[in-house]
Amino acid sequence: MEHTPCWIWYPGDFELRHSLKLHARRQERDYYRLAIWPVYDCWHSVRFFRRIELTAPEGLTVLARGKGNVGVDGKLYPFGKEIPLSAGTHEIVVEVFREDGLPCLYVEKGSLSGTEGWTAQPFAGEKLPVGFSPLFTLPEQDPEVFPFVYEKLQPVEVIQDERGTLYDFGRETFARVFLEMENQPELTVCFGESETEARAVSDCPLIETVPAGTASIQFPARAFRYVFVPGEAKLCLRVEYERTPLKRRGRFSCSDRLLTDIWNTAAYTFELNSREFFLDGIKRDRWVWSGDAYQSYFVSRFLYMDADICHRTMWALRGKDPLLQHLNSIVDYSLYWLLSIWEDYQTYGDLDFVRAIWPRLRSLTDFCLERTNEEGFLIGREEDWVFMDWADMDKDGPLCAEQMLFIRALEAAADCASLAGQDGSRYAAHAERLSKKLDKFFYDEEKGAYIDTYASGRRNVTRHANIFAIL
């Protein structure tokens, strides 16, 4: 985007900020379910740096979301004021502090607008090329607010009976609901994926209570098909479908109408879950899981071919350093994340993204290497979840399928190191050593297959390791 004006921030901060907000929205009746892993926030105090040599005088106007100043060759200026720059070399340092959100800046025009040459640093730590998103190119925008788009929805059916009023929107949606009322006593509003769920007032997981006398109210966007209002109520209900501004590029049709309908339903379901990040589900959990996201990256290539939502998800999943545990607390989900960076480069060829995320890729890879046993196999600790699948597997000790995934993740990390101009030979060497040990520890000649683990002595065989061996 070079000199195209856009909002810029410390790389990964936009994603961490919106991940923080997203993971605090899972509501069940009158309480909230919190994510079961550490959730990180953006840095709130950031410096932005730019050195430029101008061949002619020009003006510099910096807008910011937050407090701070614009430093030009050591002299400080306020935000929003045009600063004259003479021809020659200038050192620009912009400081932005925002206690309640994402610190970011916007250069309105000229040679300093856009992303080219700008780096950022949270006062301490690594100075990196700035982060940005093609979604934020206008000065009036605030990257603290995600730019969803909205479409009005009408119920396909309204059913009134002695129990209340049921609004049916025909299919699952993710929408915000507005109510307007006059002289209305206290009101209950239930949301459900099925009619049964919506009508079950005492058990409905998504329920709102509207105080008596309320003239209008807006409920946060959530997943539902049905809205049920018990009892008699005189109100005007308005619904707006909330979605991410993604362009659908993939299309499918065939002579089999049912197959076409299945594809379109799958595409719509995926659209519902393509929000700030790829979600595992729009109602439960409404969280971002690395294993689910890994599958979403593949699907996205056939439906959107949009790198931005993939990169947002990867930044959000990775979090900040120092690492406290595996991503989503699951060992294999850390490995899928490492794989996803290399595969993303193979898809989109975005070298700048690989270089920007490299420090966090490196620290996650090192974190995994620190959690290996004497043979070099990756093992789960007491606080780790060794998942791989819900299937009944022998997970006592190093898991064969996980070692295969670990080897491929190390190879991917080594490849990404090369792309970032770094030395990844240690990762490649460890992967090679493990490859040579796999058959010795995990292959059962008598069974003609790979076993789950050697530690228990049970020599149990499931399909996972053997499928991974083929892949």
Q: What do the PLM-derived regions correspond to, one by one?
A:
Residues 1-276, 309-310, 352:
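Extracellular/oxidizing-compartment recognition motifs
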Residues 13-15, 49, 124, 138, ...:
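A generic structural signal for solvent-exposed, polar alpha-helical segments
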Residues 236-238, 245-265, 271, 278-295, ...:
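Active-site acid/base region of carbohydrate-active enzymes
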Residues 323-326:
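Conserved, well-structured interaction surfaces
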Residues 407-410, 414:
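Non-transmembrane amphipathic alpha-helical segments
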